[in-house]
Amino acid sequence: IMKFKKIAALLGAFTIASSLFIAGCGNTGSSQKTWRVGTDATYAPFGFKDKDSGKLAGFDVDIINAIAKEEGVEADVQNLNFDALLPALQSNTIDIAISDMTISEDRAKSVDFSKPYYIAGNGLVVNIDNTNINSFKDLEGKRIGVSIGSTGAEIASKIPNADVRQFNLIVDAFLELQNRGVDVVINDTPVNEYYVNSKGKGIAKVTGEDYDAAPLGIAVKKGNTELLNKVNDGLAKIKANGKYAEIYKKWFGKEPPAEDLK
């Protein structure tokens, strides 16, 4: 009886271990049923936590859910700080990152990007009573707030004599602006516009022309061609069947420009 119990216990342990191994393999194979997706939920309207439901919402969330549906899988969208997204891809903590992320040469060294799903420029946000900053040319020597690892941070690093202050969350940069701790925030224009018309209404304003517009992409781990192809396939399908335009209009209140539908 004792021998039988030992054998049964060993078989049980083996079964559990085998199940875990198979489940782990499923995260990268073609039989994968759920995509683990990371986004920074402080970049409204691209990603944010809905105050009523507590769930993640936004343009990026809807886009990746629509792509996943086309590919016959679920998208489990998780909230991560922006600067943690690429390390999470590299460590296999997540499969996909979508978070208002500009496709850049530097980022493309460590991850692979989908075809562009949005074209966005970077702009300036100042306090509503500010009259000294009207363009990027006025930023020399100014206190500039940016999000760590963002395109805004890269732009700010090139401004002469600027006091660049980096924040984990873009909402913290906006709060520091409100508290007069920085003179200006450099960030993606759609997020800036959403902020000054919501939480920053009557407090802050967008000023000046956009910095060069650049494409946003969906990132996967370097070399994960199978997943990248599925993301691109789903993206092409939602652009062709009208779902992309529907989501775009929902969050930006207008039809998408032709360049975003390519």
Map each language-model feature to its residues:
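Ligand-binding clefts/hinges and TM-proximal coupling segments of bilobed small-molecule sensing domains
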Residues: 27, 151-165, 203-210, 235-262
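Periplasmic-binding protein-like
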Residues: 41, 119-126, 193-232, 254-262
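Acidic, polar ligand-binding/catalytic clefts
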Residues: 61, 74-138, 204-205, 209-210
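Extended ligand-binding regions for polar small-molecule ligands
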Residues: 61-70, 130, 148-150, 193, ...
